[in-house]
């Protein structure tokens, strides 16, 4: 292809990305209510073993959950549901970061406990974690850090569905000459992660937000 053809192809690609992200911005601006688990009659916890040592870890995690939630499991308030198929073998065979049947099973759950998943080196298969964040709109990455002897009690809120992660694998390339990746930051996305951090601070008696 000549230079003009590459430019035309990239322009069409960018048009599609921009349209997609503007539509996403519009959906976020409308907002959606969060689940109130205290009002739910039944909570389904999905368990995804993943790859490598994931099944070993998940077996022990299940033991802990069964102990901690014994009363809730006995009365049917909570269900532990195994979700199979999010393995490197199945994802590679289907050519999808999250196979359709696995994604459907995930969306039927209220809470998800997931083991580690491997991302193949090379190729174009997206990380299952990144795909899951996008498909389920898991925008808030919440990381608490506590070191009492140093007086540290911090909670970090990181936007999980924007930045380089969102579009980093969907750039454009002119073979042998250049490649470009994209980063997305929306007004609605910025506002909601900031709001989540402030709401957390208010609910937990925190007085400093930075």
Positions of PLM-derived features:
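N-terminal beta-loop-helix "entrance" segment that forms/cooperates
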Residues: 73-99
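Glycine-rich phosphate/diphosphate-binding loop of Rossmann-like nucleotide-binding domains
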Residues: 46-62, 68, 175-210
């Amino acid at each position: 292809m000549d230079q003009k053809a590459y430019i035309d192809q990239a322009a069409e690609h960018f048009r599609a990305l921009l349209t997609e992200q503007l539509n996403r911005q519009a959906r976020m601006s409308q907002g959606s209510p969060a689940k109130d688990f205290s009002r739910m009659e039944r909570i389904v916890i999905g368990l995804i073993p993943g790859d490598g040592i994931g099944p070993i870890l998940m077996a022990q995690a299940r033991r802990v959950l069964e102990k901690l939630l014994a009363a809730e499991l006995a009365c049917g308030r909570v269900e532990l549901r195994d979700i199979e198929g999010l393995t490197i073998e199945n994802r590679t065979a289907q050519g999808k970061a999250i196979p359709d049947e696995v994604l459907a099973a995930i969306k039927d759950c209220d809470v998800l406990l997931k083991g580690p998943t491997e991302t193949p080196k090379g190729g174009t298969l997206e990380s299952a974690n990144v795909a899951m964040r996008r498909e389920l709109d898991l925008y808030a990455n919440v990381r608490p850090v506590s070191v009492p002897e140093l007086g540290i009690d911090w909670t970090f809120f990181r936007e999980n569905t924007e930045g380089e992660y969102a579009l980093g694998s969907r750039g454009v390339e002119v073979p042998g000459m250049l490649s470009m990746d994209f980063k997305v930051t929306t007004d609605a996305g910025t506002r909601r992660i900031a709001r989540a951090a402030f709401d957390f601070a208010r609910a937990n008696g925190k007085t400093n937000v930075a």
